[in-house]
């Protein structure tokens, strides 16, 4: 059976786990309707992007 030759140091263990944390998603308010949207993305509520309507959203 395979067994580690040396104990993994806390530093190595921490470096390995450094990518496991959850990242906080970034949101910003849509200037047109005020709903939260992802940056550099179309607003799902009103269909606006960069000050103009890209997709017409049926109400």
UniProtKB/Swiss-Prot annotation:
TM spans (from-to): none
Key word Acetylation present: no
GO biological process, one term: translation
Superkingdom, natural source: Bacteria
InterPro entries xref list: Ribosomal_bL32, Ribosomal_bL32_bact, Ribosomal_zn-bd
Keywords recorded for this protein, A-Z: Ribonucleoprotein, Ribosomal protein
Biased composition (Basic residues): 1-16
UniProt-annotated stretches for the region Disordered: 1-20
Keyword hit for Ribosomal protein: yes
One Gene Ontology CC term in the entry: large ribosomal subunit
Gene3D superfamilies on file: Single helix bin
GO molecular function per UniProt: structural constituent of ribosome
Entry's family note: Belongs to the bacterial ribosomal protein bL32 family.
Protein's name in the database: Large ribosomal subunit protein bL32
Organism: Sphingopyxis alaskensis (strain DSM 13593 / LMG 18877 / RB2256)
Gene: rpmF
């Amino acid at each position: 059976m395979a067994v580690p030759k040396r104990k993994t140091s806390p530093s190595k263990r921490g470096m390995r786990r450094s990518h496991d944390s959850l990242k906080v998603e970034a949101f910003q308010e849509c200037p047109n309707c005020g709903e939260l949207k992802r940056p550099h993305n179309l607003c799902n509520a009103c269909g606006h992007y960069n000050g103009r309507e890209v997709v017409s959203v049926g109400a």
